[in-house]
């Protein structure tokens, strides 16, 4: 009986440990595969994710490349502004309400990138390579270059 209880306990611990190591977010590509890109909510989320990933990239390179770090922050803020505009148009929100919600959303997403970037660093000594973060940055770069 003790062995069965021990096996059950170990099973739950190993399952929980795998959940802890899993990424916080799914990639933007996976997200968009399940959503309608024409939907305003999807577009707002995409703009927020891209703003967050550019903010994250800016923070990572700040000490080694301040010029590009500043460019990334400018891009992130531009994407954030577009998200605010879309919320006002799509959801008929007031400017201040839209701004607060978008900033809170970006902060949460930014923290998720930080957490997943740290996990990726522990795994392969890169904040980007070998993770969905690199893929997200590539997708967002295409979005920024289209505009």
Regions found by a protein language model. Name each.
Residues 4-14:
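Sec-dependent N-terminal signal peptides
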Residues 76-147:
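Compact alpha-helical subdomains of small soluble proteins
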Residues 30-32:
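Short, charged/polar, low-complexity loop and linker segments
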Residues 17-26:
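Cleaved targeting-peptide boundary
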Residues 24, 43-50, 133-136:
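Stable alpha-helical elements in mature extracytoplasmic
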Residues 36-92:
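Short N-proximal segments of mature Sec-exported proteins
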Residues 12, 18, 143-147:
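Secondary-structure boundary elements
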């Amino acid at each position: 009986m003790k062995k069965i209880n021990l096996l059950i306990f170990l099973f739950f611990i190993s399952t929980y440990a795998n959940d802890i190591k899993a990424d916080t977010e799914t990639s933007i590509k996976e997200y968009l595969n399940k959503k309608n890109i024409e939907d305003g909510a999807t577009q707002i989320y995409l703009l927020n994710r891209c703003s967050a990933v550019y903010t994250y990239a800016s923070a990572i390179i700040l000490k080694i490349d301040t010029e590009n770090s500043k460019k990334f922050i400018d891009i992130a803020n531009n994407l954030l502004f577009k998200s605010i505009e879309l919320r006002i148009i799509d959801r008929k929100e007031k400017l201040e309400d839209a701004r607060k919600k978008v900033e809170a959303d970006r902060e949460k997403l930014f923290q998720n990138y930080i957490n997943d970037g740290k996990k990726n660093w522990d795994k392969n000594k890169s904040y980007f390579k070998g993770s969905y973060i690199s893929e997200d940055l590539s997708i967002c770069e295409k979005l920024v270059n289209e505009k």
